[in-house]
Amino acid sequence: MKTLLAVPSCLPGGLDAEMGMHFGHCDIYTLVEIEDGKILNVSTMDNPPHQQGGCLAPVQLLAQAGVKALLAGGMGFRPLMAFHQVGIDVFFAGGAPTVGAGVNAYLAGQLPQFTEEYTCHGGAQ
């Protein structure tokens, strides 16, 4: 089964790019299509401008693109709950220096589920 994985990234995106450590403030998303533990395709998607409540806009954008999992180093509680509502699994990849390192850790089953303990507390809860 194919899975589309999104990773908040610094420009220009891609597997060699530095991970964007806060999902809502990243430059771009790297989208990685995976099947049977192998990377099939890598592409990028722009992050919409961050405005009031702006962390929820990318959730919808990524859901509409067919994303099923997201790696993140940080995010607020509201977007985490929104990802749960749209059926996107979120994994904590705070120690990954690059997108590729995060993806490899995900493929190896080394990343924990992103839970409330990892959230930052900016904005309304």
Residue map of PLM features:
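Non-catalytic interface/targeting segments
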Residues: 1-53, 57, 85, 91-125
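Mid-chain, well-packed structural core segment of small domains
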Residues: 59-95
